[in-house]
Amino acid sequence: MKEREFLEMVRTLPVFTTKQISAILGDYRYSKVYLNRMIKKGLIRRLKRGFYTVHEDPLIFATHIYYPSYVSLWYAFQHYGTTTQLPITIEIMTYKNGSFQNMEFIKSRHLWGYHRIKHLGFDVFMSDIEKAIIDAVTTERVPLDEIQNAVKNCDIDKLEEYTMKMDISSMKKIGFVVELAGFFLEKVYKKIKKDRNYVHFYTTEKGNKWRVVSDRF
């Protein structure tokens, strides 16, 4: 296959694999040699073993390296316009930890609450704002004031529905943060109020019905 023809084909894909190329070229070993030649020429990039792209914009391929996966946290808040911060790193929730250039993959057991958006003609999996709030609380990777601002711009009923899917400790933290933002998750509180255990969280607030205590003291 001629280089020009090859590049025109893979430009339509966010990510392509050695297996895909070998199906086209008809020889797995030759495909590996062919792809290595393309890398040396600077025409394609290796993302991880067996995965390649021709694109420079990481958002195009960020959610196509691991499945399932979706963009969340800072980048999601920026997408929804709830923060003025411009994130340098794209944080992706998936089933394992890892990093590549300006992407960080964060392990999560809760890979739901996201949807498909279009970016430069490609599919990208983006967190719902409500799930981004939950991810921000449970990972403790976003300042509380930023999370509270997102809470003020979300669907509270949907946030409560999502929160009810979480474990008791996470429910307490989320309920606590939502109340700081001026709202109250009644169903969540009814679920957790009989649990007498305290949970540690990155807050300076003391004494609250959610049994959340600061881990800074």
Regions found by a protein language model. Give the residues of each.
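Short polybasic/polar patches that bind polyanions
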Residues: 39, 78, 179
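Short amphipathic alpha-helical segments and their helix-coil junctions
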Residues: 54-57, 108-119, 153-158
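Hydrophobic alpha-helical interaction segments
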Residues: 118-217
